[in-house]
Swiss-Prot record:
This is 4-hydroxy-3-methylbut-2-en-1-yl diphosphate synthase (flavodoxin). Pfam families: GcpE (PF04551). [4Fe-4S] cluster binds at C269, C272, C304, E311. The keyword Oxidoreductase applies. Converts 2C-methyl-D-erythritol 2,4-cyclodiphosphate (ME-2,4cPP) into 1-hydroxy-2-methyl-2-(E)-butenyl 4-diphosphate. Its EC number is 1.17.7.3. Belongs to the IspG family. It catalyses: (2E)-4-hydroxy-3-methylbut-2-enyl diphosphate + oxidized [flavodoxin] + H2O + 2 H(+) = 2-C-methyl-D-erythritol 2,4-cyclic diphosphate + reduced [flavodoxin]. The gene is ispG. HAMAP family: IspG. The lineage of its organism: Bacteria, Pseudomonadati, Pseudomonadota, Gammaproteobacteria, Moraxellales. Binds 1 [4Fe-4S] cluster. GO terms for biological process: isopentenyl diphosphate biosynthetic process, methylerythritol 4-phosphate pathway; terpenoid biosynthetic process. Pathway: Isoprenoid biosynthesis; isopentenyl diphosphate biosynthesis via DXP pathway; isopentenyl diphosphate from 1-deoxy-D-xylulose 5-phosphate: step 5/6.
Length: 371
C-alpha cells in the first residue's frame, strides 16, 4: 500500500454550524442553491438532494430582506449547516444572523461604514456565527484593477488581506477565506500566496468554472493540485449544473487523492475487444443503483483476465470478466464464480452485504470504545 504523501497545511479550526473547518477536521464539501430563495419549497428540496449526495454545508443567496425571511423558513426545515451569501446591505446580514445562519459569506469592505461592519461582527459573535471572506477575480476593487492592470494572484491576495485586516482589528477570527478566479493558474497562484500569509482555513474553488465537463476538468486540476500541496480546508465545485453534481465531483476529487471517502470508489477498465461483458453498461448501471451508498469501499470491475486479477486483489470486491462465468474476489482473495449475464444484480447484492458487515463492525467498535 502506497503511503499518502499529502501533508495538510496547519490552519486554525472554525465552526460552521455542526461542521468544523480547518485544523484536523476533514475537508468538507459544499454547494450553493440555484433556486429562487423566496421559493422555500424548491430551495429546501434542492438542499435535501444535495444532502443526500453528501453535502456537508450549503450556501444560500440572500439578496433582499424578503429573501432573508425565506432563509429563516428554510433554516427551520433543514439540518445541514447553512451559509448566507450577503453583499452590500449589512441589514440583511443582521437579519439572517437572527434567523439562524451558521456562517455569513461577506466582504467587510463592501458592507459599508466601519460602524456597519462592527454591527455585523457583533451579531456574528453574539450568535456564534463564523464568516467567509470571498474574494473574486471578477469583482476586484477598482484601485487594485488600476494598480495591477488585470487580475493577478498578488491582486487577489492584497484584496483578501484588506478584508482580513478589518476583521482582525475587530478581534474577530472565526472566518475562512477564498480567492477565486475562473483561470486555473490564477486560482492556484492566489491560494498559494494566501496560504503563505495567513493561518485561517481556506475555502477552495474555481469560480465560473463552466459547464459540467469543462468545469469538472478545471476544478479537478486547480483544486486537486492545491490539495496535493496540502492547501485547502473546504471546497466547492462551481458548475453550470445541478448543485448535487457539484457535491459528487467534490467527493470524487477527495476520493482520488485519498483525503476523504464518501461511497464507492469504482475501478473499471476503459474496455476493449478483450472484454467478456459490456463494461460501460455494467458500470453505468452500478453507479446508478449504488448511488445511495456512503460507506467507503473499493469495487473493481475489469472486463478480462489481463489486468483484472491484479486490480481485484486490491479491492474490497473485485470482478474479473470471463465467459460464461466471471471470477469474484473478496478482500483480495478468490471467492467464487458468478454468471456473467447477472453481473449487475450480483455485484449490487455483494456490495450491500459488505456495507452491512462494515457498518455492523463499526457500530460494535463504537460501543466497545465507549464502554
Amino acid at each position: 500500500m502506497i503511503e499518502n504523501p499529502i501533508k495538510r497545511r496547519p490552519t486554525r479550526k472554525i465552526r460552521v454550524g455542526s461542521v468544523y473547518v480547518g485544523g484536523d477536521a476533514p475537508i468538507s464539501v459544499q454547494s450553493m442553491t440555484n433556486t429562487e430563495t423566496c421559493d422555500v419549497d424548491a430551495t429546501v428540496a434542492q438542499i435535501e438532494r444535495c444532502v443526500d449526495a453528501g453535502a456537508d454545508i450549503m450556501r444560500v443567496s440572500v439578496p433582499s430582506m424578503e429573501a432573508a425571511e425565506a432563509f429563516g423558513a428554510i433554516r427551520k426545515r433543514v439540518s445541514v449547516p447553512l451559509v448566507a451569501d450577503i453583499h452590500f446591505d449589512h441589514r440583511i446580514a443582521l437579519a439572517v444572523a437572527d434567523y439562524g445562519a451558521d456562517c455569513l459569506r461577506i466582504n467587510p469592505g463592501n458592507i459599508g461604514s466601519d460602524q456597519k461592519v462592527r454591527e455585523v461582527v457583533a451579531a456574528a459573535r453574539h450568535h456564534g456565527i463564523s464568516m467567509r471572506i470571498g474574494v473574486n477575480a471578477g469583482s476586484l476593487e477598482k484601485d487594485l484593477q488600476k494598480k495591477y492592470g488585470e487580475p493577478t494572484g498578488q491582486a487577489l491576495l492584497e484584496s483578501a488581506l484588506r478584508h482580513i485586516d478589518i476583521l482582525d482589528r475587530l478581534d474577530f477570527h472565526e472566518f475562512k477565506v477564498s480567492v477565486k478566479a475562473s483561470n486555473v493558474f490564477l486560482t492556484m497562484d492566489a491560494y498559494r500566496l494566501l496560504s503563505q500569509q495567513i493561518d485561517n482555513p481556506l475555502h477552495l474553488g474555481v469560480t465560473e468554472a463552466g459547464i459540467y465537463r469543462t468545469g469538472t476538468v478545471k476544478s479537478a486540476i486547480a483544486l486537486g493540485g492545491l490539495l496535493m500541496e496540502g492547501i485547502g480546508d473546504t471546497m466547492r465545485i462551481s458548475l453550470a449544473a445541478e448543485p448535487e453534481d457539484e457535491i459528487k465531483i467534490g467527493f470524487d476529487i477527495l476520493k482520488s487523492l485519498g483525503l476523504r471517502s464518501n461511497g464507492i470508489n469504482f475501478i473499471a477498465c476503459p474496455s476493449c475487444s478483450r472484454q467478456e461483458f459490456n463494461v460501460i453498461q455494467v458500470m453505468q448501471a452500478l453507479e446508478e443503483r449504488l448511488e445511495d451508498i456512503r460507506t467507503p469501499m473499493d469495487v473493481s470491475v475489469i472486463g478480462c483476465k489481463v489486468n483484472g486479477p491484479g486490480e481485484a486483489k486490491e479491492a474490497d470486491i473485485g470482478v474479473v470478466g470471463a465467459a460464461p462465468r466471471s471470477l469474484v474476489y473478496r478482500n483480495g482473495e478468490k471467492s467464487h464464480l458468478i454468471d456473467t449475464n447477472q453481473l449487475v444484480d450480483e455485484i449490487e447484492t455483494m456490495v450491500r452485504q459488505r456495507v452491512q458487515e462494515l457498518e455492523e463492525a463499526k457500530s460494535k467498535e463504537i460501543i466497545r470504545s465507549s464502554s
